[in-house]
């Protein structure tokens, strides 16, 4: 059975504010905008290296984030994938230097979820409206980037399956955490896309609305994969309404950093 999945709180670490939790000896966090060194209107804790920010600022922001979560000594093992809005999942089962270098080559080619079953390997994915999903089980964890393409492809369920295989656990052992994202009443999409989602997910009603609730679809996919409803926590934090705390690609006109 999954551990209680409601242990998430907002904590300030010398200016770096995290929405964080810990389950099965895995510590995880969703970052906010504050506490970094990036400059301009989108300051300051930008973690994305692909948005035109100073690379040294990004490196320092990532270092501060790891320090805040208690993983500063593991910075040399940090994994940050090239996110491509797909459904490819990469699994990490060794923290050896050569093995991690091989993983870095794989994730540089593109992946949107990383499963990890070894200690001292921090995993960092970047977001600005898309849905962050953290899966935690005895013996491992997964971090998932789920935009609409990944959501309709059920990437969270695929990461769940990969985590179960790698950690030797069952889906009902998993606790799932859905982080800050663009909420269903903020995300208007085309009728064609609504119809596609409605054909895939029972929770999506394309007949009455064009507002797409990605987190509801993710929850359905996880439950279909065997994760218990009681083991799924949605922080219900909005990147749009709470744009002062989180980056929002849509709310900021397509120009923003990444948390």
Question: Where are the regions a protein language model picked out?
Answer:
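Active-site microenvironment for binding and transforming phosphate-containing groups
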Residues: 1-259
């Amino acid at each position: 059975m999954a551990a209680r999945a409601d242990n998430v709180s907002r904590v300030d670490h010398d200016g770096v504010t995290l929405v964080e939790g810990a389950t099965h000896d895995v510590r995880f966090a969703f970052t906010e905008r504050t506490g970094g060194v990036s400059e301009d209107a989108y300051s300051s804790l930008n973690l994305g290296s692909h948005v035109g920010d100073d690379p040294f600022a990004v490196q320092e922001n990532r270092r501060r984030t790891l320090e805040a979560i208690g993983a500063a000594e593991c910075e040399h093992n940090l994994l940050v994938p090239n996110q491509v809005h797909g459904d490819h999942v990469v699994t990490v089962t060794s923290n050896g230097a050569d093995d991690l270098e091989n993983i870095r080559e794989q994730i540089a080619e593109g992946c949107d979820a990383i499963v990890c079953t070894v200690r001292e390997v921090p995993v960092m994915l970047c977001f600005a409206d898309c849905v962050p999903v953290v899966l935690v089980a005895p013996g491992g964890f997964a971090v998932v980037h789920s935009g609409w393409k990944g959501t309709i492809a059920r990437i969270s369920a695929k990461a769940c399956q990969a985590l179960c295989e790698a950690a030797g656990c069952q889906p009902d052992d998993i606790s799932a955490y859905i982080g800050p994202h663009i909420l269903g009443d903020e995300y208007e999409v085309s009728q064609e896309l609504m119809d596609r989602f409605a054909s895939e997910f029972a929770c999506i009603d394309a007949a009455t609305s064009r507002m797409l609730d990605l987190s509801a679809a993710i929850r359905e996919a996880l439950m279909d994969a065997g994760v218990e409803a009681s083991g799924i926590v949605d922080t219900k934090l909005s990147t749009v309404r709470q744009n002062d705390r989180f980056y929002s690609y849509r709310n900021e006109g397509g120009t923003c950093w990444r948390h």
